[in-house]
Amino acid sequence: MAKKENRIIITLECTEARKEGLTPSRYTTTKNKKNNTERLVLKKYNPNLKKHTEHKEIK
């Protein structure tokens, strides 16, 4: 019997663009839900704002 996979696909969304009412940039990535139980926060590039911003995991 196969084990249940621990890696899940998540979506990261820009928080600064959301506050300003602009179109937020989104990235998809994977995370290990066994090691990282809380929501993921990464600094990624937002092409709409042309700078690196904080991206948070969304449902």
From Swiss-Prot:
Keywords: Ribonucleoprotein, Ribosomal protein. Transmembrane segments: none annotated. It holds the Pfam family Ribosomal_L33. One of its GO terms (cellular component) is ribosome. GO terms for molecular function: structural constituent of ribosome. InterPro entries: Ribosomal_bL33, Ribosomal_bL33_sf, Ribosomal_zn-bd. Residues 26-59 are annotated as: Disordered. GO terms for biological process: translation. The keyword Transferase does not apply. Belongs to the bacterial ribosomal protein bL33 family. This is Large ribosomal subunit protein bL33. It comes from Chlorobium phaeobacteroides (strain BS1).
